[in-house]
């Protein structure tokens, strides 16, 4: 599927996709080296490249929330989830997290941490 999609891309959009792909190895290196602020900046660069792929990647509400987050401490982020919204994953330095969480009080905050086991999702359910 990905190969078919890339073949249909214009040369400009193809360059955007390849820039994003190149970010993968750099992102891994930055995380492993503990260069998390640079990782946050790279997330921002990747998000900006992804938005260039098409108008349906984002919308005004998402852009406003993302820009607000950058102005209030986030260094970068990206939209995750299926079309029509999803959620923003933001990198915010530890010393700025509480400020941003307070500023985004009308949104849902889901804390996360890195796991050595790969991707994990934990559900807490209360049974009545």
Placement of each model-derived feature along the sequence:
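Glycine-rich active-site/cofactor-binding loop and its immediate structural neighborhood
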Residues: 85
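C-terminal nucleotide
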Residues: 1-76, 89-128
């Amino acid at each position: 599927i990905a190969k078919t999609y890339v073949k249909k891309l214009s040369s400009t959009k193809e360059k955007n996709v390849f820039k994003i792909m190149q970010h993968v190895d750099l992102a891994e290196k930055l995380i492993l080296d503990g260069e998390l602020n640079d990782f946050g900046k790279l997330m921002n660069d990747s998000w900006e490249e992804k938005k260039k792929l098409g108008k349906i990647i984002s919308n005004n509400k998402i852009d406003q929330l993302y820009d607000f987050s950058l102005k209030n401490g986030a260094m970068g982020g990206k939209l995750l989830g299926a079309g029509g919204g999803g959620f923003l994953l933001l990198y915010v330095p530890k010393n700025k997290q509480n400020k941003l969480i307070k500023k985004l009080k009308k949104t849902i905050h889901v804390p996360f941490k890195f796991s050595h086991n790969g991707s994990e999702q934990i559900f807490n359910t209360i049974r009545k």
